[in-house]
Amino acid sequence: FVRFDDPFEIIAHLMVGSEGTLAFLSEVTMKSEYDYPYKASAMLYFKTIKEASRAVVAMKKLVDETGEWTVKGAEMLDYKSLSSVNDPVFLKYKGEVASSALPGVEPGDETGLTAVLTETKARTPEELQQNISAIEACLQAFTTYIPVRFTDRPEEYSKYWAIRSGIFPSVGGTRQPGTTCLIEDIAFHIEDLPVATAELQQLIARHGYNDAC
């Protein structure tokens, strides 16, 4: 920032911060994270976003023998996200809902299906299997749409994360012409997640943001 006297160069080297403020980098501290050699992921499907959130809260409490979190990452994908990428499980669910094949789900109401892309990592294959077993045991208390299946094969779980990476442009591509994409970060206490996510969906629908996710 102080290297330039020309106002144009000063502005060109600023970055846009929170709420549109301008900022510059005066100091950077880089901290690396341990790259666990063994990883596994699973796409967990639940019939409601509230049930998915309850499962996330429960998995957040899992720790291994060293006190580290068992679940290293959890990304929630609602029905709109799944629909935008033509997720095969979502399409299957939608078909079963349409044919009234799912008890407790109103025909045509496929908006409840929610996926949680879950990742666990470990230093050894044995630790990885212990983590998977702990997560599977935790999930027995919840109702999943399809059986839980973790994979430790990179060629398989990389596809899950590729889907996650493609969600934003895919959802954006479903917007009506002339509309604007708004992005907002919202934080909740983890214990409030089940109620908060369900109420947030209701709030978005009530105000006519039909393409939101």
PLM features: what roles do these ranges have?
Residues F1-C213:
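Noncatalytic alpha-helical scaffold of FAD-dependent oxidoreductases
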